[in-house]
Amino acid sequence: MKMAVLQFDTCNADSPRFERSMREVWNQTLQVIISFVIQNPILTTERLILRRWGESDREPFARMNADPRVMEFFAERLSREQSDALVDRAEAHFREHGFGPCAAEFRGDRTFIGFIGLSIPSFQTHFTPCVEIGWRLAANYWGQGLATEGARAAVRYGFETLGLQEIDSFTVPANARSRRVMEKLGMTYNPADEFEHPMLPEGHPSGAACAVSVASDGVETLKC
């Protein structure tokens, strides 16, 4: 009889041992889920894997966000905490909307190289709400057409899978690299079509931007 009581106590849902056991099972299950998500990408291209974010992405992403070359046209370089917050927001966007900015891997060696993907801007201006295509890659991977390759796949996903009718993008007019990518996506730029980014102080050198868009039927329309 004592043996029976002892066995029951080890399985008692109120016992500390049971709680520890369930936490261990949950943690193991969570790791399996995370591993599955990371190993099963959202999109693949000839050279890229676009997937959900993992913990191992945080350090290289922070290095990238502290690189003055990468952040040339942004308001500031980011601290590790600010960079991690971007990862958290990207994952929150996936949970809320079912899509978001994807972590980008180079297929050749599975190296994390930045992000590419769709998101809903958090600020309000005359062309929002909208869905934006954006990208940010480590400087070592510039000039190889990777941003264009990944962005094309993301735009196609937005139109064909999500059923979007229009996708927008915006950049600082001086950012020639991003403008070239936008042009390759079928977007157009006009110097007259600029706006002040509402999340930056008036007159900030990175505050002036131009938004452009491409419609699902391939007709380019300006959104400025």
Residue ranges and their predicted role:
Residues M1-A13:
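Extreme N-terminal basic, low-complexity initiation segments
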Residues R69-A90, G100-C102:
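Conserved GNAT-fold acetyl-CoA-binding loop/helix
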